[in-house]
Amino acid sequence: MLHFPVLLEESVDFLINDLDGHYVDCTFGRGVHSKLILEKISSKGYLSSFDKDPEAYEFGLNFKNDNFKIRHDSFKNLDKYFKDNSINGIIYDLGTCSTHLDNAKRGFSFNKEGQLDMRFDNTVGEPFSEWLEKAKKEEIIEILYKYGDEKHARLIADAIIEMQKSSPIRTTIQLASLIKDVY
């Protein structure tokens, strides 16, 4: 399933202030924003896109346009690629998208069985299941509350810690079931 951003037209129309300008899509994903930006800018305009997800990067390499370049890197490294004041506009569409949730192998889905990974770039860092095994209760609470806006963060953390005593949580369905039981 393709990810369709909310307010796509409006956000791109607001972004483009010079048809000949240089724009940056910091979260390429499946290229929905990038495609529309490329349709709207002139032949003198340019679009640079970033994604640290290897699958998104590979997908972006299929965009055949001389006014476009995708980089397999995090947007936190923008200053490595551009001089000050060389960009007319930047767009971010943060968070997970349907392509992450629909693919059980990515480890984000709570509807499909898969290894509990949850990394945008699975070549960097450790899977979430490994982090969860070592995490302290307060760290789990902070992650759930801060990034998941989870009102039952403390109860879920307690359940995770308790379950980890008998067996590690390795799959998305194990975690989803545990959270469901808390509710």
Where are these regions (language model features)?
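S-adenosyl-L-methionine-dependent methyltransferase catalytic core, i.e., the SAM/SAH-binding region
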Residues: 1-183
